[in-house]
Amino acid sequence: PIVISSQILNRQDGMDEYHARPDDIEKTADPRQARKFADKVLIPEKDWHSDRRMILGFRTARSGMTLAVGADHEIITENEYAALIDTEPGMGKRVYRVEATQGRPIRIDKAVAYHTSRGVPVHELFDRVRRSLDRVREQGHNVYYDEQRAWLDDYWATADVEVEGAPTGIQQAVRWNLFQIAQASARADQLGIPAKGVTGSGYEGHYFWDTEVYVIPMLTYTHPRIAENALRFRVNTLPQARRRAKELSERGALFPWRTITGEEASAYYAAGTAQYHINADIVHAIMNHARATEDKTFLFRDAAPVLVETAR
């Protein structure tokens, strides 16, 4: 028999059903390396399952943000099989034990939905996850494959960089980095773009001035809507920047060196207070976006207070 196991797991709890523990992160002085959390970050609030679906709900310990994740499974095979599904706080699993035979394929269609919010309760996010998974069942997976392909075709039509005469590895590296930018920025949703994107835990998910200097210029010329969406993070966190300026006896606003919420997140005072160029980086990105798009709507309607406060 073949055993196929699909799990939703909060890995911070330490180990999965096979007792596999995430590697302990070596303690070093490297600021890029994320540390283990001393306390639990995701607090389980709710779990539920049916014959083919499992949903888990969490709340973050400090900020109170909510999260729900659900998975649907469908097995398609002529082989005999037994199925088990179960959930508990912080973990859900769907297990198939298939009596596999030669020439009879085993196919499992799986759909996963995530919903998160700063203020919506977990039970409401459960309903949103259910509706998302219901749509996948009704419409089929191919609809989403086609939508994803269309989005990526549009992205590469304007973002691709061809390196002529260079070794294959150079072209591959350039396109890999462009793909990572797409992953990290496409759904920033007026939040920042983490320094390590969505491919790792380095820098603990913090946003730096690198976004305005390196990432947003590229997006401004290729996908200005995504660039504007990322710039809105600075507009939305202007109140925190004003408070930071007062803490350092400055006028106007001082944007943080590294942040998630808009507050300075660095525990190293020297680095967190020395880099005054960050204000200029942000203003440069805003003005470059306005000039490149020849659209001053975002500048005058939303971003002007940032320019004023950083100039004081």
Residues covered by each model-derived region:
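Acidic/polar, glycine-enriched structural segments that form the non-catalytic walls/loops
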Residues: 1-203
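Membrane-interfacial loop-to-helix junctions in multi-pass inner-membrane proteins
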Residues: 298-303
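Short, surface-exposed connector motifs at secondary-structure boundaries
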Residues: 294-295
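Substrate-binding groove/exosite segments of carbohydrate-active enzymes
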Residues: 142-291
